[in-house]
Amino acid sequence: MFTGCGLFACVRRCDGGDVRKRGEAGAMSSRVAADPAGVEEEGSCKNVAAASARQLAWADVESVTGGFSSRVIGHGGFSTVYLASLSSSRLGAVKVHCSSERLHRAFRQELEVLLSLRHPHIVRLLGYCDERDEGVLVFEYAPNGDLHERLHCSEVAGGVASVLPWARRVAIAFQVAMALEYLHESRHPAVIHGDIKASNVLLDANMNAKLCDFGFAHVGFSATVGCRPSARAVMGSPGYVDPHLIRSGVATKKSDVYSFGVLLLELVTGKEAVCRDTGRRLTAAVGPMLSEGKVADVVDRRLGGEHDGAEAAVMAELAMQCIGDSPGLRPSMADVVRALQEKTSALASAVGSRLDRKMMF
């Protein structure tokens, strides 16, 4: 997910053609039904921030991108990202994604999931457009990028190193845990995120976590590889994927728990899920040391000792439980939330921590 500028809008292409050459005659797809409480009268995209998951016209999407002629600010393997002006003072990013008919169905499934979610630590869907083959999603602003950037690319303006403080790491772990607990325990049927990783955790103006990217989410107790448009949809991301999922081809809530365990290890160690130089997985690199109780040996050295040793031990122990080989022995996300809340004093002083549990709606 691109988070570099303001609101993020994701446009998924289905035919690989030049989006600028498509006129109003583009194929009309059947629209996804939205929650009545979240639908407002269609209008300009300039006011999208005031709405709740508004259904937008394709003309609005073209307007904010200048007919897709605005400055290109990013490229991906299958996408181009355009700078968009949502208002006189608000910028956004429109991602044009080359896809297929099958992936368009996946987009519609993602939209249906997003329309049903409301939690303070899940990125909020502000608007969408499903008029044509292209699908557009507009999300809330996340000015501080994503957790991967903050944890592993820690430079701020002027080139001064900026290490994510320990208390903030604990708060982020707790907030992501609450978001997953909400998906697993408060939604009926449960929602399996399917791709928990540091780059899918956005950080708002107060550095609070917002779980994002539900493109591979599954609704229900479990999902198999065969029922998704691609193996990537179930297999997650390198370094985070549950080995049991690889063996069985079945994603469950405990698959998310495993990925969250890897995220905990990242927060404790400051190291990436997969080493860029060696390709070694973080779980393999630090797992043996943690099994021997050598927590102090793996804590991020950039913290300079400014962390709570007892809290680090709690985080490490939880991480090891989450990445256990047997899914049945892994804790639930409710168990993780409870343990973090009871055993980490950093939560008491971190912004938006304990009170956030009362904000679920």
UniProtKB/Swiss-Prot annotation:
GO terms for biological process: regulation of hydrogen peroxide metabolic process; regulation of response to oxidative stress; regulation of response to salt stress; response to cold; response to oxidative stress; response to salt; response to salt stress; response to water deprivation. Accumulates in seeds. Mainly expressed in young roots, and, to a lower extent, in leaf veins, seedlings, stems, leaf sheath and young spikelet. The keyword Cell membrane applies. Residues 67-347 form the Protein kinase domain. A lipid is attached at residues 5, 10, 14 (S-palmitoyl cysteine). GO terms for cellular component: plasma membrane. Disruption phenotype: Increased sensitivity to salt (NaCl) stress with increased oxidative attack on membrane lipids and higher intracellular Na(+)/K(+) ratio associated with reduced phosphorylation of CATC. Keywords: ATP-binding, Cell membrane, Kinase, Lipoprotein, Membrane, Nucleotide-binding, Palmitate, Phosphoprotein, Serine/threonine-protein kinase, Stress response, Transferase, Tyrosine-protein kinase. The active site is at 195 (proton acceptor). PROSITE patterns: PROTEIN_KINASE_DOM, PROTEIN_KINASE_ST. Belongs to the protein kinase superfamily. Ser/Thr protein kinase family. Acts probably as a dual specificity protein kinase. Regulates hydrogen peroxide (H(2)O(2)) homeostasis and improves salt tolerance by phosphorylating tyrosine residues of CATC thus activating its catalase activity. Promotes growth at the seedling stage and prevents grain yield loss under salt stress conditions. This is Salt tolerance receptor-like cytoplasmic kinase 1. The lineage of its organism: Eukaryota, Viridiplantae, Streptophyta, Embryophyta, Tracheophyta. The gene is STRK1.
